[in-house]
C-alpha cells in the first residue's frame, strides 16, 4: 500500500462536500486543507466555501487558460495561512489588504516605479475585475505577473465565462501610469500594470475604450511572444 502522504497528494480531499484537488494546496495542508475556514454554502463554488480563495476550478478556456497556466494559487500556503497573511483575519467579512503606492514595485529608495504614458488608438488591454476599477494590463499578461488575489478569477455577476475577464481596445488616446507590479498575494508580480486616471467604466462611457467581444480577442498570436511575426 502506498505511504499515507502519497495517498493524500494523489487523491482529491472531500471537505464540506467539495473535492479539493491535491495540487491546490501543499501536501502539508492535508488531510484538512480547509481547517479554520468557515464554509459558506452561498459560495459553494469557491475553495473551502470562502470567496477570498477563488473558484474551485480555474477557467479552462483560451485565453484565460494561458494566462493562468503558471499560476500557483496560494504561494505555498494553506487556506487559513493565506487568508491570515493577506487579509489579516479569518473573519469572512474581512477582505484583502492591498499594497501601498497603487501596487507598483518600489525602487531602492522606496519610491514607486512608474511613468505617465499615453495609450494610443488600437492598443488592447485587459482586466480581471469589474469595470469600476482603474487598473488594466497589457493584453495577455500572465496572472502571476499581475499579483492579483485568487478571488479575481471567480466569475462575475452572470456566473458565465468570461464574465470577470474583460478586454478593451483604445478608441481615443488617454494617459495613465505604467510600471512594474509589486509582489503580493504570494505571486512574483513584476508584470506591467497601467493605473488609469479614471475608472474603466468612465472611459467606456466617454468613448475612450470599447469592450471587445470574445471573438475579437481570440487570436493565439496576441498571447505569445513572436519576435518575427508572420515568418515561419
Give each language-model segment a name.
Residues 1, 231-232:
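Polar low-complexity intrinsically disordered regions
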Residues 1-135, 142-144:
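ADP-ribose/NAD+-binding catalytic cleft of ART/PARP-like enzymes
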Residues 80, 84-230:
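Catalytic toxin/effector domains delivered as secreted proteins or via bacterial secretion systems
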Amino acid at each position: 500500500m502506498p505511504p499515507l502522504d502519497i495517498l493524500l497528494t494523489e487523491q482529491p480531499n472531500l471537505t464540506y462536500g467539495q473535492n479539493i484537488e491535491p495540487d491546490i494546496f501543499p501536501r502539508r495542508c492535508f488531510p484538512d486543507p480547509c481547517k479554520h475556514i468557515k464554509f459558506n454554502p452561498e459560495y459553494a463554488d469557491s475553495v473551502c466555501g470562502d470567496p477570498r480563495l477563488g473558484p474551485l476550478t480555474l477557467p479552462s478556456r483560451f485565453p484565460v487558460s494561458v494566462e493562468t497556466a503558471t499560476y500557483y494559487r496560494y504561494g505555498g500556503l494553506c487556506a487559513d495561512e493565506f487568508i491570515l497573511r493577506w487579509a489579516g483575519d479569518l473573519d469572512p467579512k474581512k477582505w484583502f489588504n492591498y499594497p501601498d503606492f497603487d501596487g507598483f514595485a518600489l525602487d531602492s529608495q522606496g519610491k514607486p516605479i512608474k511613468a505617465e504614458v499615453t495609450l494610443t488608438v488600437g492598443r488592447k488591454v485587459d482586466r480581471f475585475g469589474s469595470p469600476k476599477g482603474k487598473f488594466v494590463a497589457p493584453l495577455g499578461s500572465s496572472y502571476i505577473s499581475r499579483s492579483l488575489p485568487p478571488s479575481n478569477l471567480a466569475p462575475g455577476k452572470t456566473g458565465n465565462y468570461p464574465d470577470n475577464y474583460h478586454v478593451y481596445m483604445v478608441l481615443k488616446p488617454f494617459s495613465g501610469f505604467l510600471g512594474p507590479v509589486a509582489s503580493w498575494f504570494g505571486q512574483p508580480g513584476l508584470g506591467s500594470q497601467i493605473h488609469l486616471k479614471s475608472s474603466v467604466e468612465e472611459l467606456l462611457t466617454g468613448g475612450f475604450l470599447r469592450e471587445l467581444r470574445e471573438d475579437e480577442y481570440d487570436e493565439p498570436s496576441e498571447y505569445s511572444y513572436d519576435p518575427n511575426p508572420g515568418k515561419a
